[in-house]
Amino acid sequence: MNQSPQRPKAVVLSRPVRLLWCVALYVLVCVLMAVFQRSLIYTPPVFSRQRVDMMAHTARLERWTNSSGQFIGMKRPSPRQPAEATVMITYGNGSSAIGCDHYANAIQGVADFDIFILEYPGYEDRPGPPSQSSLFSAADEAFLMLPAQKPVYLVGESLGTGVASYLAGTYSNRIAGVLLISPFNSLTDLARSRFPMLPISLLLEDRFPSETYLRNYHGKVGIALDGKDIVVPDKFGYRLLHGYAGPKKLWAFPDGRHCQITGQPAIFWKEVIAFWQTARQTDNVESSR
């Protein structure tokens, strides 16, 4: 009588071995996160110089260079000179200086302001790897090149709010007002919410602690938040708002998605500029759309 072949017995790992495998997998994930974290934080668009120049021409922007002739961003002087003030823009991840022409259009549509847009290292055709350190160094260089005799305002969006907050805290006496669009209180808190099982506070190198930098700034800070923002949930912006002790104003868009402010009408920018320029120190004024 033929006997049916016996099935191989399944290998059953002991509990200590299973635990060891879980620990090894967790450590591997942590190592990968530490090694590739900047690839997750920064997703720069990269273009040739020829394409950048072509897009800049279409957007009515011109190259902004430092004293050595190196590319540091884009600019658009006010069509009506002399300009009343200067606005420096720090954009969000995945965007670029050319991609901020809509801010120049909106702001110059209601005010005679010169617009300067910082380009981050590694973005468009600017050389260098992006990191918190390189972005801050680029911001320092660019800010110090702005005209000193006019009021300077900062507009930051998403990741760029970390750069704008750094500038506000570093050059507090030179900055007349700030607008932060879809901001976070710190990238550490935002990352921790995305990866709650990982020791983010130990792994993260680029922390962008906006709330810390703004402690050194006492000027006017406007904050625009979108209620349906899934990239930077508005709770992180509210943390930044409530933690700021200076004069502030909130624009809340309950149905808005990430950085949807770009579609706001001229009245929004008129309100922002009026808030910046008013002599009365308004504290914690809220406006909903």
What are these regions (language model features)?
Residues 217, 222-229:
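Short beta-strand/loop motif that positions the catalytic acidic residue
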Residues 156-164:
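Gly/Ala-rich beta-loop-alpha elbow adjacent to hydrolase catalytic centers
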Residues 70-145, 162:
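Membrane-embedded segments
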Residues 103, 210, 219, 233-242:
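Short alpha-helix in the alpha/beta-hydrolase fold that links the catalytic acid
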Residues 19-64:
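An N-terminal hydrophobic leader/cap segment in hydrolases
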Residues 227-232, 258-259:
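Acidic catalytic loop of the alpha/beta-hydrolase fold
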Residues 163-219, 260:
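Hydrolase active-site cap/lid region
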Residues 256-267:
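Catalytic histidine-centered segment of alpha/beta-hydrolase-like enzymes
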